[in-house]
A protein has these predicted regions:
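Short Pro/Gly-enriched beta-strand edge/turn motifs at strand-loop
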Residues: 84-92, 145-154, 239-242
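Short Gly/Pro-enriched turn/cap motifs at secondary-structure boundaries
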Residues: 10-13, 93-97, 155-161, 246-250
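Structured, charged N-terminal subsegments at the starts of enzyme catalytic cores
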Residues: 1-43
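Active-site rim segments in enzyme catalytic domains, especially the processed small/beta chain
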Residues: 112-177, 201, 205
Length: 281
């Protein structure tokens, strides 16, 4: 639960838990301004922590060494939150026990809503096609680890950590709407930014998708879209983040949202970075 909204993601073995862990860390902070170094720094640090925990613990649930309940507990979120300082830190996992994706969403007048995502991974998936049918098989095994001590090590009849995560928001048991951001490991980062844009900064769905994004690429390295204030970028660099501003916006995900307001009016928004469309009939 994030500030009165329930954020729904697919459970492990997918990484839908990653944005939920980041939101669980962030809910202990108060945000007033989106484009400030303090806000972005806290979001970026929480995202790094969540990715580190996802890499450490998420795999086929039968093999996980930490439970979803522990990873999303208030106690663990608070412990991780206390690790955030005024400086950029190398990501590390905690101890809770102590591109070619397609997304669509739809809604009708009867209140039915669908959040849907599909991807074969790595463009054409495995490159193996069912003879005579042209159906390409997926390549999700790419994310298995070959380290025999890693929780996500490849094994027979085991499902790997994967990246496809359609999202959904509810409030007080009522559907608010589906959302999603395509883009491999950008997906949980996009989910985090879209959810906070809407809930913390009161953006409408289109504004939430239009806003400049950042992406963690490893270590202390972040890519940012043009449009982020230069002084904010400089402040983040002074805090220890390695920031690169890119003109190419194609790597920052592609999203769609449907939002139902308190009067029951539906609003659809589509990604300005791609060829999506919001259609009503």
């Amino acid at each position: 639960n994030y500030r009165g909204y329930d954020v729904w993601e697919l459970p492990p073995n997918g990484h839908g838990i990653v944005p939920l862990m980041a939101l669980n860390i962030l809910k202990g902070f108060d945000f007033t301004t989106r484009e400030s170094a303090e806000t972005l720094h806290r979001q970026m640090e929480a995202m790094k922590m969540a990715f580190a925990d996802g890499d450490r613990y998420v795999t086929d649930p039968k093999y996980m060494k930490a439970s979803v309940a522990d990873l999303l507990s208030d106690r663990y979120g608070e412990a991780r939150r206390r690790e955030i300082t005024g400086r950029a830190l190398q990501p590390h996992y905690g101890d809770p026990n102590c591109g070619g994706t397609v997304y669509l969403c739809t809604a009708d007048e009867e209140g039915n809503m669908v959040s849907y995502i599909q991807s074969n991974y790595c463009h054409f998936g495995s490159g193996v096609v069912l003879p005579g049918y042209g159906i390409a098989f997926q390549n999700r095994g790419y994310n298995f680890s070959l380290d025999e001590h890693h929780v996500n090590c490849i094994a027979p009849h085991k499902r790997t950590y994967h990246t496809i995560i359609p999202g959904f928001l509810t409030r007080e048991g009522r559907a608010v709407g589906p959302f999603g951001v395509m883009g491999g490991f950008m997906q949980p980062q996009g989910h985090l930014q879209v959810v906070t844009n809407v809930i913390d900064f009161h953006m409408n769905p289109q504004e939430a998708l239009d806003a400049p994004r950042w992406q963690w690429t490893g270590g202390l390295h972040f890519d940012m879209e043009p449009g982020m204030p230069l002084q904010v970028v400089e402040q983040l660099q002074n805090m220890g983040h390695d920031i690169r501003v890119l003109e190419d916006m194609s790597q920052f995900g592609r999203g769609e949202i449907i939002w139902r307001n308190e009067e029951g009016v539906l609003a659809g928004a589509t990604e300005p970075r791609a060829d999506g469309v919001a259609a009503a009939w």
